[in-house]
Amino acid sequence: MKNVDCTVLVASCDKYADLLAPFVALFRKYWSACPFQLALVTESDPGVEGFDRTIACGKGGTWCSRLVQALDAIETPYVLMLCDDYYLERAVDTALLLRRLEQMKKYSALNLRMIPNPEPSEKNSLAFAADGSLREYVKRTAYCVATQTGFWDCAFLRRLAAKTASIWEFERYGSYDFTDEEESRPILVTREKEFPFLDAVHKGAWETWGVKCLKENKLDFDFSKRGLPSFSTRLKEAVKRFIWKLNPELVTRLQNRFALGAKERKG
């Protein structure tokens, strides 16, 4: 019987359907004892075996609208949300994750992130007295809300998703959007990376470590769908990272104020 408190929710779309067979193969290899239902939310059913459930929302929606539909269909109060390119690279510590889920409930957390990204600092986080292995992100700081791997309170996640369209807007605007009730509830982050995944794709192109992971696990991948990023793309991304690191808070607030930054493309 699957855990009744949490669902693993994988967010995808038709453009990234080629990532799903490797995703689920690695997931089942490295987390064969996963106690949670594995649900996929996407546009069209990709016909990939290995998911316990597929929520096909149809064409014409956005990343956020599909997320809202999925959360309305899911009956558990929490989700462990993953993107479709979060490929497992070694075995998951199930006992550790179950302990983190219990902490979500115990501390009434909005989110418990299992990778310290953005890196916790004295400016964006606080010590969490109840558990020294955790820190608490300061609300209304850049990317205190982010789609890095973690447990989410479904009601909080749905409220934010209902107000935005793209994954990037969800993170940027959501980091500054909290109700009075949510103000007293923590956003927690582990000091170490506790979910052993790699981000296999960036800006629609394979990362070299993503391809290496597939080759090492003898998994097929379709290079006709996406290749490695060009030099110009890598240079552009490096410049953007450099600018962002100069003052993350200022850059994010300017993006929100003037509707800058990445936007979702339909079709």
Question: What are the residue ranges of the model-derived segments?
Answer:
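Membrane-proximal basic amphipathic "stem/tether" segments
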Residues: 3-4, 11, 218-267
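A structural signal for short, well-ordered beta-strand segments and their strand-loop junctions
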Residues: 39-40, 79-81, 110-115, 151, ...
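Catalytic core and acceptor-binding pocket of nucleotide-sugar-dependent glycosyltransferases
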Residues: 144-208
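Short beta-strand-to-loop acidic/aromatic patch adjacent to the donor-nucleotide binding site
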Residues: 77-87
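N-terminal anchoring/stem segment of glycosyltransferases
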Residues: 1-59, 64, 71-73, 77-78
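Conserved donor-nucleotide/metal-binding helix-loop-beta segment in metal-dependent transferases, i.e.
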Residues: 91-120
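Short, flexible, basic/aromatic active-site loop/helix in glycosyltransferases
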Residues: 126-142
